[in-house]
Amino acid sequence: FGSQYTQLIARRIREIGVYSIVKPNNISLKAFKEINPKGIILSGGPDSITKSRKIRMTVDIKKLKIPILGICYGMQYIADIYGGKVSKSTTREFGHSIFKIIKTSKIFPKRIAGKQIDVWMSHSDKVTKVPNNFRITGKSTNSNISSFSLEEKNIYALQFHPEVTNTKYGKNIIKAFIIDICKCKKEWTTKNIIDEKV
């Protein structure tokens, strides 16, 4: 969705040892199927879900049967298309915030279960109601809904940015999604880049 951190998400995944690629929101269904991903991450972005002409995915993610992680705008997008509610915040939240895990979730490794952690926020909209059947898993200093999930369908949403170094345990959260939830194998290294270019 055009976040300044999008490439950083891909980098974090590759650091784990898993191949990842960045594609635009308007990728065609045909191109999407050709990639055949094991999971997708919906990035943040500068747009607002509350606008009438907001940025949307061309692919209907509600029909996908693979794990989904929404970050920032990606979280708000999931809330919106599944029938939740997103509202404009009175003040933009940017910078450090305290996030508290209030429900267990596969996206949060056991070592951080129930903890309060420092996270990095960058958003002006907020989810005020989660969709039916989804459950709130975390809250922050300025929001009662900072993460939610639909565990049985492997759909997860985070308002904060786990990909930036300012978020404590961010790499662990991304790894939990990639390895434990998407079941990806660590088969990619920088040597793959050299082999592809040669």
Question: PLM features: residue spans?
Answer:
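RNA-binding accessory domains that recognize and position tRNA/RNA substrates
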Residues: 1-42, 46-52, 56, 62-64, ...
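Gly/Ala-rich beta-loop-alpha elbow adjacent to hydrolase catalytic centers
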Residues: 70, 74, 79
